[in-house]
Amino acid sequence: MPSFDVVSELDKHELTNAVENAVKELDRRYDLKGKGSFEYKEKDLTVHLTAEADFQLEAMIEILKLALVKRKIDVQCLEVKDSFASGKLMKQDAVLKEGIDKELAKKIVGHIKEAKLKVQAAIQGEQVRVTGKKRDDLQEAIAALRAKEFGMPLQFNNFRD
């Protein structure tokens, strides 16, 4: 029986490259030169931003988003936290979300059921397995999922026939 998995994954190597590109862009910008920094924690997928003022943090977030887009990483996975003061500096965290949580998985399964396709969807940890009798049914399910916005980038992998 044909099946595929719906996942939400980040390419960690591309993510590292995007942050490095953002650091280079920060050094190139005359208005931000020497006034801010990016610190990427690969373990917990967090980028710590430090600057002298709030408006500089906003500019740095835009630089980071632009670098992510250039590296073909969907910006929807970026969750920007509130900025806070730390001495004379302003700090802000940007967390990159990966994986499908239970709430999003339920939305995906519900959307597939609403579409009344001849497929079954089952939640398996941080992914959703979709099975059907025909490959065409699976392609319709993929089209239905791509048409709806879930707030997270979705990838389809592990096709089995």
From Swiss-Prot:
Domain of life according to the entry: Bacteria
Any one GO cellular component localisation term in the record: cytosol
GO MF term (any one): nucleotide binding
Gene3D superfamilies (UniProt xref): 3.30.70.860, YajQ-like, domain 2
CDD domains: YajQ_like (cd11740)
Matching SUPFAM superfamilies: YajQ-like
Pfam families: DUF520
Function: Nucleotide-binding protein.
UniProt family annotation: Belongs to the YajQ family.
NCBIfam families per record: PRK05412.1
HAMAP family with a match to the protein in the record: YajQ
Protein known as: Nucleotide-binding protein Pfl01_4421
